[in-house]
Amino acid sequence: MESAKLTVPHTVTALCDALRTGGFEAYLVGGCVRDLLIGREPKDWDITTNAKPEQIQALFKETFYENDFGTVGVVTESDDPRFKVVEVTPYRIEGKYSDARRPDEVKFSDNLDDDLKRRDFTINAIAYEPESGALVDRHGGKEDIKRRVIATVGNPGERFNEDALRMLRAVRISAELDFAIEAETSAGIVASAKQLEKISRERVRDELVRILMSPRPMQALYVAQKLGILRYVIPELEDAIGVDQNQAHSYDVFEHLLRSLQHAADKDWSLEIRLAALLHDIGKPAARHWSDEKKDWTFHGHEVVGARMAKKILHDLRISSEMSATIVSLIRWHMFFSDPDEVTLSAVRRIITNVGVDHIKELLNLRICDRIGTGRPKEQPFRLRKYMSMVDEAMRDPISVAMLKIGGSQIIRLGEEAGPRIGWILHALLEEVLDDSKKNTEEYLESRTRDLMKLENEKLQTLGEQGKNRREKEDEEAVQELRKKHHVS
């Protein structure tokens, strides 16, 4: 038996100590051991033991047990959310999987080896005892980590027929770790791909989301397509393979979508942007027409077709209605910034209304992904920087009398008659506030208004015009500052 010295948090070792003190074995197992051996920080910590669920619960003050697999959630006193709940599971033997989703029955075992041989991949079938440093590796997982390969424990066909989601999980882990899928395991995926139809869309969605949020989603989806399982995740993507585009693009629609997605991942952008990037041109195959006049392919209206298709795809994947609405909106309007003749400040204000203030920057980021996905080298050419400046300009709060903590109706209540003098007073007040923002209080402005109300029309108009000119000057300076920020004139 090998040994190793791996760094394990005290909260986790304390749970193992409690199990051993109670007379039971306790090993870390699965992804946390794999990650420790690789040098990654584990996101989850799993303990396996020969104690039964009721024995585990008897050892710890606060637990919950709400599943058919024996897994007990142990609530710790740690403030760190990573260790707040640690799962402790008895060694187990699983019976037949008649539905390719879950075992027909689960039996608990007293033997660690029984538990390790039921696991999915060799790199996840290594157990580690923190106290002694013992490393139990019966299936060559440590060697596969060195080789950077993903291989099933035992026969691939049997493992995938037990739980077909393991095929998608292999692709996901390959993207997270940048490991290759071993040849026999790959062949097993090809042979068993159709079994994915039996998996609930919620479970498929969860694995897909983890793929999309990994550092290498483009690589993962390429592998999924080559192994024949992409069609059981988002079949519409396969329709984009080999669909040539116009001369502005270097790649077919499929590769363009994957490259757009990868840029979103490289930028560590949100799931919404990643899904929008993956699906933004999904309508192109259906909208493609040859133009004799242009001697090129056209895709008029593909954003409308794509938005409809994306809505259906996202519903099928059980994506939340709120997130789906955001993604569909981004896809529907993603062509807005592609036509410089249409992009006026008023048009930008309208598009902000269409996609929402909270999502306009996401639309710009999607445009960046779209551009990078064409194979063009520049991420932010002058035109895109100009659009960003226009968005900032359209969204900023204008310098105006609306900034004041007093309005025309209040001035009338103070005794001034409705008419042009109201505007002069407001602009005179604005100039003072622009000089000293501390004066923008209701108390000060009411007091100052009473003074201004005593002035003759000519003097008050002069002060008002000065304030108005000052507002226009400051407003223009603010706009120029925004343009300077984005390096546009």
Place the predicted regions along the sequence by residue:
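Catalytic cores of the polymerase beta-like nucleotidyltransferase superfamily
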Residues: 1-489
